[in-house]
Amino acid sequence: MTTSGAAAPQEAVEKPVSASYRYYVLAILVFVYMLNFVDRQIIGILAAPLKQEFQLSDSQFGLLGGIAFASVYSTLAIPLAWLADRSSRVWIMTGALTVWSGFTALCGVAGSFGQLFLFRMGVGVGEAGGVAPAYSLIADYFPPNQRARAMAAFAFGIPLGTAGGTLIGGLLAAHYGWRTAFIAVGLLGVLVAPILRLTVRDPKRGGTDAAAAKSAPAAEHPASARGMPTDDGLGRKVGLGAFGVAGGMALLAGLSLAGMGVANPLIPAFGAGLFAVIGVSLLIARRTGSVIMRKKSFWLLSLGAAASSVCGYGVAGWLPLFFMRSFDLTLSQVSWYYAGIALIGGLFGIWMGGSVADKLGRRSKGAYPLVPAVAFLISAPCFILAMNSPWLIGLLPGGGSRALALIVAFLIFLIPTGLNLAWLGPVTAAVQHLAPAPMRSTASAIFLLINNLLGLAVGFFYFGWMSDLLRPAFGEESLRWAIYTGMGFYLLSSVLLFGASRTLKKDWVD
């Protein structure tokens, strides 16, 4: 019997579920995750009209796509995940979907850059509750030997959402304006929210874990009950250290707003609010933090994923504008072109990463980070080759045709786009095995906090800032060179994930 302070929700399902229902739930979660990325990534395809409307530099647009979203998305994920470990995960996801979709629609009525910045923060508030609870649900619907593939299937929402946001958002913006694009995709999520709530049930926590079925750990002390000693001293250090992180993020946010010319009184208010959210979030997570943050594998996996996300989010957010500047494509053409790359390459890469890792993981747990480590080593040169393929085609006898150059570039871009997402299934599955079942949502949220604060916030801004920095030397081609410089993050990610492959076996929790 569990204590009331951390009891599972009363509606939790105790009876076994059928395979068909399990896959139905996975399909619904994939669709919700797709909407998550539609609303998150639509801003990339709308870069040109938004920059024109509000007269933004690349650096300012990078702040809009990065820190405006990531600052609240990353930090609020922890208290919402903590709540999901103690209450209905489905209710939390339903509310989150409604909030982020509503704020996406509000972006369509923004009358100034400051309003758009705040509405993008609202999108981040909602999306903070949409991922970690889903990871926990999947872990409780699928047994350990199927989790990497299930996580990979869930991650299909990323290329589906990126492609959908690019195609739908771009075409709507080209024909009806960018405001219509925001409103249309936002209202779609509001309509889907009731379906999620009414058809998806919370499964028994830890019910698919053989070890969990044999033992019932005390809810108040799940770590020690699973043979994992707690360390209250470390927990306090994690909580106190949160305020150092909060201070740094508050300073960064304040400087960002100051650089955008936002009224001075808003700067300390925003900074103080962000300080409080991050501090309270990590104080809430200190018990889980005392379990997973002592593990070297957690840091290597988290920082490795974050390094790759600097490129992943950055390239995904800026490639549409790159195609318009360097490939001379229109907004409608880019919508179809990049949507195809994101969809085909992304689906293949995610499924390949999960399938290969599950197969190799039966022999060695180190395969889970090793598969994406190898993938990233291949990604960097392939991106550079794809970006230069029109120039290479031009060296052919007769100079080649523009159509041939675009086709060749499309085919080459599929390779790094797929490999870029190969980490999602293996790494997220591995993180689920670094903590016992009652801590999985919070463990996932801490992982996502690191990944998104370093990856999403830094990545989107980095490429815009570097593009502005290089513009005096390279003009309209500055974005190309900015993306080149970012490829080093893939190499860093490979090194970190290679390290995780050597430590994961020791830290693994069945």
Predicted regions and their residues:
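Central cavity-lining transmembrane alpha-helices of secondary-active solute carriers
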Residues: 64-81, 340-353
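Conserved MFS/SLC helix-loop-helix module at the cytosolic interface between two early adjacent transmembrane helices
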Residues: 75-114
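Helix-loop-helix hairpin linking two adjacent transmembrane segments in secondary transporters
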Residues: 154, 158-201, 232-270
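Extracellular/periplasmic helix-loop-helix junction of adjacent transmembrane segments
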Residues: 46-75
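C-terminal transmembrane helical hairpin of 12-TM major facilitator-type secondary transporters
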Residues: 369-426
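Helix-breaking motifs and short loop linkers at transmembrane-helix boundaries and internal kinks
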Residues: 55, 88, 109-115, 143, ...
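Cytoplasmic helix-loop-helix junction between adjacent transmembrane helices
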Residues: 119-158
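Extracytoplasmic gate region of multi-pass secondary transporters
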Residues: 43-44, 242-268, 296-346, 350, ...
